[in-house]
Amino acid sequence: MRMTTRRVVAAVGIAALIGVGSIGGAQEIDPALGTYERAAGEVSGSLKCVGSDTMNNLVALWAEGFKKFYPSVREAVEGKGSASAPPALTEGTCTFGPMSRDMKPSEIDAFKERHGYPPVMVPAAIDMLAVFVHKDNPLAGLSLQQVDAIFSKNRTGGAKDEIRTWGDLGLEGEWKDKPISLYGRNATSGTYGYFKEHALFKGDFKPTVKEQPGSSAVVQAVASDRFAMGYSGIGYRTADVRVVPLAAKHGAAFVEADPKFAYSGDYPLSRFLYLGVNHKPGTALDPLRREFLRYVLSANGQGDVKKDGYLPVTAAVAKRALASVGIAAD
């Protein structure tokens, strides 16, 4: 794997978190994370975040919490999709680039050509990508090979046959002959890219997948279509849908989308949510970017993560993340 971005913990994986923090498997904030304290100097300017739709609500919560300490800061959050973050960072038209996936080599190369060094991808939260069905759907679980056979036209994961109907998954009665209505994201979305790589084994989506403009729209579509299936971040779950337990391979036990299984690495579609940063090695960040990252990776900022339905990072991860942009942990 090309490690051309300056990423902090993605190389060791989310499972490594279980050994570096004191939160265990619960969705709790690591008590070793300090409470954010206002900086002594002046912090002002425009805080503009361009990128992930999945992270849109979360980034807005961070900005809102940050402004309580620095009311003069102006904020703007544009959730256009993760693909919009790298060019905005490269061109200098944003302060941070939220992304729900890693940068592609071509995106990193474009940044390096302009600036002479790679961007930094700071892990700021943990997400579980979920497969949703209608709340009345009795499906017990899916292997990733079955997910691939449902959503992909290639079946790169090794499934012998295409899965088209609920009966193909063993459902009886009213479900048996009903086609599975598929909902997903478009190609600008980091969620689309992550699902394509990890659930479709880098295969191609079927043309019958109905692309939605955002994560919330996918969940709403599944909630209103009894015979639907869709994928989105776990933070968009509502009472009108069910999250399907997943197995990493055929014949393995189904794993619930539970925080303890994200931390342990047992849930097969866990991922980091990143803030992309333009940081020249050996230099100090300006006060606005420095303090925003300190807030995000504090107990306050990780409280926002939990509030929005995602999983907080540990103090050890936060310390390494801050160090990657030259910030000493409190």
Predicted segments with their positions:
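Basic/polar N-terminal segments that are highly enriched at the extreme N-terminus
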Residues: M1-R2, G24-A26
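Bacterial N-terminal signal peptides that target proteins for export
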Residues: R2-V12
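Flexible loop/hinge segments at secondary-structure junctions
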Residues: A26-D330
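Bacterial N-terminal signal peptides
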Residues: A11-G21
